[in-house]
Amino acid sequence: MKFTVAKKAIALTGAVAMLGSVAACGSDTASGKPAQDKDVTEITVWAWEPTLTQVAKDFTKKTGIKVDLKNVGTNTKEYTQLDNAIEAGSGAPDVAQVEYYAIPQYAIKGNLLDITDKTSGYSDFYTPGPWASVQFAGKVYGLPMDSGPMAFFYNKEVFDKAGVDAEQIKTWDQYYDAAKKIHALGDNYYITSDTGDAGFFDSMTWLAGAKPFQTSSDGSEVTVNLTEDKGVKTFTDFWQKLLDEGLVDTKTAGWSEDWFKGMVDGTIASLFTGAWMPANLANSAADGAGKWRVTQMPTADGSTTNSENGG
């Protein structure tokens, strides 16, 4: 299926239900209107989530529509290519997996397909948070693929070698103590890495109880104060201590081959991230199979975990 219009609307998600509804997500070359289902023989999907390979096969078997599934990179790597394709007026996919935070930026520019009328009743399939995250200005632009309650993933082989029981790490002070023991295994061993991800900062400050955002009563103004929030300071003090003492890898780029290699060989021994991570470990750090475990996130004071990351 070919498109000749300057821009085409993109539906953003990775869920199989959405794939079923984008049979009309292409553009009619004459009118620029969505093509009819009967015209569609192939759709292009950009996604990095490995389980979608089987979803695409099942979709083709069900509908007869071929799915050209491409992994063009994760996060900003994909978004850069997406932006370039949209600007060029060609090469953009029909469906793209993106994180929830990216939906508004594309919706504002008119790059997304409004699928509100195609998703009536779908909200019952999802919890309120993820469902609200695919909406902007009262319109639905995708279907949730997952949500990201935070979890503590760790390489048990490395933790055992360092004499650390990850299941007993309940506070950030205990995590700091574990970081020192793991780094003692060798100069290239780190309890985790710092990839400079702003989403990680948001999640960890949230976990520390931060509320640096204030909204006016009419919702027209938002004030952000990161310098005086107690939760922000709690996290930044903790994390800065790890950085100052060289206990965190700051040189390996997140989601790179070296990053996943570190998870396989144990030099990056744990991750604080969303509960969606297992599929990525299985796909990109397969040689580490059997070494990794997951447990509850430690918190500043050992209280209940209440944060999320990505999705």
For each predicted feature, which ranges?
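Short, well-ordered beta-strand elements
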Residues: 37-50, 65-70, 94-95, 141
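Extracytoplasmic/periplasmic substrate-recognition and gating elements
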Residues: 237, 244-248, 284-311
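Short, low-complexity disordered leader/linker segments with a strong preference
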Residues: 1-43, 61
